[in-house]
Amino acid sequence: VKKQEGKTEDYTWLNRFGNMGTFLKNDIKLIRRNKRSRTTVIISALFLLYGLFFFTGSVEMYETPVMWVFAGIFVSGGFLFTFGQYVPSWDSSYYPLMMSQNIQYREYLNSKWYLIVIATIVSTLLSVFYLYFGWHAYLAIVVGAIYNVGVNSYLVLWGGAYIKTPIDLTSNKKAFGDSQAFNVKTLLLTIPKLLLPLLVFWLGNWIWNETAGYLMVALAGVAGFAFREPVFRLIEKIYKKEKYKTLSAYREKAA
């Protein structure tokens, strides 16, 4: 039995993706083996229940289509917000070693992006029970997922370049958030993550109707996906620029 478990742990099926597959294997092992990362995944799963505040009519101020879009962003993006925004801090313990091996930032970032996208899709599928509260509830979640994949997935990786706080994988301390991980740049990136989709929906709803609002938010996500290559080049450039500051911060905290 132990031999079979060890073989399963190898995730050899990811080898077909080259170096990116290696990064994905490392992330999966990190999540499975460490207390902090497992707790983060559990917290991200709890985001699936966040929509109950918005779609059940329990809170009157949330009974508006704009707030439904807000809920959709969070329900589908639990992993994106709890895990994604702390890239590359998850790898802080061996980040200097990785950098000494001259890894390709594109492959590293791609692996994180795919992990976020897969988690977003899984969250969206698991939230299908919201159809019980009406088609508008699940539509808001699907639209939120499209925006998360096409826009927010880039923004969390972008913001991660400015976070210089290492993560202790053996401890659940600050598992619900670390104030040191926020700065002016990361806070500014919060605007397009949370407020821009609400503004886009509001404009579509105001000019035309609710359906147009949902469509415009979804199109914003599709447009972001279409510009994936230039956006990744920009993010890669930022990571390279911040490389030595990040390494210095991790080494300083480890000392």
List each language-model region with its residue ranges:
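A glycine- and small/hydrophobic-rich beta-loop-beta segment
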Residues: Y95
